[in-house]
Amino acid sequence: MSKFIEPSVEEIKLEKVYQDMGLSDQEYEKVCDILGRQPNFTETGIFSVMWSEHCSYKHSKPFLKQFPTSGEHVLMGPGEGAGVVDIGDNQAVVFKVESHNHPSAIEPYQGAATGVGGIIRDIVSIGARPINLLNSLRFGELDNKQNQRLLKGVVKGIGGYGNCIGIPTTAGEIEFDERYDGNPLVNAMCVGVINHDMIQKGTAKGIGNSVIYVGLKTGRDGIHGATFASEELTEESESKRPSVQIGDPFVGKKLMEATLEAITFDELVGIQDMGAAGLTSSSSEMAAKGGSGLHLRLEQVPTREPGISPYEMMLSETQERMLLVVEKGTEQKFLDLFDKHELDSAVIGEVTDTNRFVLTYEDEVYADIPVEPLADEAPVYILEGEEKNYNTSKNDYTHIDVKDTFFKLLKHPTIASKHYLYDQYDQQVGANTIIKPGLQASVVRVEGTNKAIASTIDGEALYVYNNPYEGGKMVVAEAYRNLIAVGATPLAMTDCLNYGSPEKKEIYQQLADSTKGMAEACDILKTPVVSGNVSLYNETKGTSIFPTPIVGMVGLIENVDYLNDFQPQVGDKLYVIGDTKDDFGGSQLEKLIYGKVNHEFESIDLSSEVKKGESIKTAIRQGVLSHVQTVGKGGLLITLAKLSAHYGLGLKSLIDITNAQLFSETQGRYVVSVKSGKTLNIDNAIEIGLLTDSDNFKVTTPYTEISENVSDIKQIWEGAIAQCLTTQD
């Protein structure tokens, strides 16, 4: 008889306890069919987390199959802890993005901190040393005190973990809209570097080999965290605060260093982070990938307090833990290593030839499950979508007040400088950061070489909401352009798909169409998807977030020497590359004037993106250009203002466009500055002005003139977010 008081198999069925764990009636019946009997309490919990949306992708898996996952540089694609891409010289870059949305909505500091810790361990589990962190964040408008609290907590959590563990946060993006009220998006990305011969996989194989647990002792924090992340946020969500994990960056640092030492041992067979679904997912997934079985003796698991049941051990998401499989007879070598790093560790089981996942506690069986159905046979749901009716009429922008619109957009938190927030992150630790957070992708040198990794993280919501297919293409192209802007060759990408409930027809269609667009862009831009994450059910009180796909992309710079003088200077001429059209559907201008986005916009020309990108990259590397900036939210006038304010340079420009086109967001455009004495030879490049040593920012069109002090623009742009957060306290 069990020493733990739990519902019986009959009670689980009759009282539908499985529903509270996240299993539907049909899923419960499928579990019964797989087992040939009714599952006990621990088994029900194990299936519920492994078949949760967060772990199984049961609503998104058909769409993920569209993505190209192989390519010239890809060494390891989806299926492991992170993607791995070759960068030459027997080296590779390892990267991935993950969401921690629901936990951050309930406990913003810990939700964000553990999101950072988890993505770091994903990179380390491959054997790579992390070189930088990035993040993509979404919050509701800052006139709401709850959103202010969430923003402050998330930023402190990101900085608190990353700064303590010693990894620089070098790039990111933050946007604000009322559709994220109470449901922030916190997507964390990590990039690492590894030698080819050190690449690890999360696999359990070799009959009789031992399973080692290392890291923090298991507690009751984060139980059913994966299930919680697969539900809508409701008024009852606050009661699920225990589902939010607690991070310890100092233990995280010890675990990282110990793991990176352990991968040098030839006796290491496989390794995986204990992330979502904790010990359950790491162990069962390793067994599935190894084509083997596992027997775990749970009384050997290090626990924080007495009386923790097998159910709690298996579903706990206590942070800073790794699971290793090592060759039989070499266990002490690993235990001694972990002891040296002051980490708890224990041998908790062994690999078997049964293809079953068996859990015992003091010789009593608490679970006996076939591995493959548990890890790989979660139900997949193909639902019916519903196309959105597009508004093909045109809004009127002929009478806008250019100056008033300019300043309203400049100080909107989505467009305003994020330095007030990013300054809370350590951007330089490790001393390899070349380009810090600002107007472009970040660039981090590969230590001991003249190479560098450029990385960016970008998201799109308004355009995806307006037209999911075209918006999906746009978000991939935006990341591509940001890498081109620092002279990098884009290599591959990771994605995080943040959407509402897929059980709603319109949202399911958004997911279907946007991933189709993303896949098409990946094909044409040659940026395969090597890792990723899906976060659904992002809804609060029945209101869904905007569909928000996030793309993290990395690129290679073979020689960083050209970056030594890659900064705009007085006297540099300015050019815009790409046509400016009447593109206002989904723009910040449409949202500002009409309060919503509901109009079509032109499709993006991906072939043109490639041609322009190659030309610009060549011009950068040949030393022709001193700065490249993509034209993004707010349009050309805002882009020029940000350039001027960021570098403290005057600007004089003459542009032949209409007042409204100053704020058009036509895709595929760049603003470039050409070094004095150099000639730009790129198709469709139009000279629009030059940089000066004055404090004057002057833009003239046939219809208007903007003339403002650069110092005033800088003060408004850089001070907007701080003002929102301080005046509302």
UniProtKB/Swiss-Prot annotation:
GO terms for biological process: 'de novo' IMP biosynthetic process. The active site is at 54, 100 (proton acceptor). Pfam families: AIRS, AIRS_C, FGAR-AT_linker. It is found in: Cytoplasm. It is an enzyme of class 6 (ligase). Mg(2+) 2 binds at residues 122, 273. Substrate binds at residues 99-102, 121, 245, 317-319, 535. Mg(2+) 1 binds at residues 98, 533. InterPro entries: PRibForGlyAmidine_synth_PurL, PurL_linker, PurM-like_C_dom, PurM-like_C_sf, PurM-like_N, PurM-like_N_sf. Keywords: ATP-binding, Cytoplasm, Ligase, Magnesium, Metal-binding, Nucleotide-binding, Purine biosynthesis. CDD domains: PurL_repeat1, PurL_repeat2. Its EC number is 6.3.5.3. GO terms for molecular function: ATP binding; magnesium ion binding; phosphoribosylformylglycinamidine synthase activity. One of its GO terms (cellular component) is cytoplasm. Pathway: Purine metabolism; IMP biosynthesis via de novo pathway; 5-amino-1-(5-phospho-D-ribosyl)imidazole from N(2)-formyl-N(1)-(5-phospho-D-ribosyl)glycinamide: step 1/2. Its main location: cytoplasm. NCBIfam families: FGAM_synth_II, PRK01213.1. Monomer. Part of the FGAM synthase complex composed of 1 PurL, 1 PurQ and 2 PurS subunits. Belongs to the FGAMS family. Part of the phosphoribosylformylglycinamidine synthase complex involved in the purines biosynthetic pathway. Catalyzes the ATP-dependent conversion of formylglycinamide ribonucleotide (FGAR) and glutamine to yield formylglycinamidine ribonucleotide (FGAM) and glutamate. The FGAM synthase complex is composed of three subunits. PurQ produces an ammonia molecule by converting glutamine to glutamate. PurL transfers the ammonia molecule to FGAR to form FGAM in an ATP-dependent manner. This is Phosphoribosylformylglycinamidine synthase subunit PurL. It comes from Staphylococcus aureus (strain MRSA252).
